[in-house]
Amino acid sequence: MKTLSWRVSEVDESAVALLASRTGLRPLTARILLSRGHGAPEQITRFFAPRLGELRPPTGMADIERALDRLIRAIHDRETIGVFGDYDVDGVTSAAVLTVAMRALGATVVPRVASRADGYGLTVAMVDALAGQSCRVIVTGDCGTSDFAALGRARERGIDVVVIDHHQVPTGPRMAYALINPHQSEDAFPFKGLASCGIAFYLMAALRSRLGIASFDPREMLDLVALGTIADLVPLLDENRILVAAGLRVLTARRRPGLRALIEVAQLTDEAIAADQVGFRLTPRLNAAGRLGDAQLALDLLLAPDDLQARALAGQLDEV
């Protein structure tokens, strides 16, 4: 068995003492925070008590305005919008965020997720299937950046594809109608660690703002964003930390039938849902659908309209 050696970061002990005295933290906690680059009291406040009001606006996200213009046109012209997510939890929750929001904002949406048997990402066959359901726009979640064959097929069929993704951007032609990916060179948003569900949340919040529909509150979707962000193991810093902290509060309220049923089958009885419970009890069940069964089951659960349907789907999911 390989022996691992720990490398402990060296920290100025006088800085540890000063930070502990200024914040009331224990010296060990102050040392850990300093080793992670959190030295100012205001940084520590944001770390321990992140607030939604501290989310930076999507200014600088490449192609977000182009994506918004196309989605608004689709809603106004009553075009059918296809939503397609990858089969992991980030992809499924991205698809759920997009579907919930756009339906609430007046769109006709056909939601689909990838099948592991068909491989990762948007496929030519899926483009054809969504075209067969009269989709004129496709919005992807957690895939699409490098799916050149499928993007080419969509272009041939006159379908505009809005890609929401956070995977690395390969060299090659940009074939999507709009690409919202923090790793493209044109993107100027300061935080590059968002999961796709977080990017989807930003896009939908901006869409609601542009349409001026006050009856829909994007914050209601933060339970989904917390699930996808935690499951994808992205750094819980900056925007991710804010979204997850707020999302755990929404999840604890248990307002979504599908997640209420999932919490029941996971036998979580604590009043408050914590990040470790999401990571070890909830998201593995959702992931199992995509890895061992059909990820559409997980998406259907998240979109379930009532407790009766949600409990039936959660029971099926728990047996996968």
Segments from the language model and where they lie:
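Phosphate/pyrophosphate-binding betaalpha-module
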Residues: 139, 166, 173-174, 195
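Phosphate/diphosphate-binding loops
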Residues: 137, 141-160
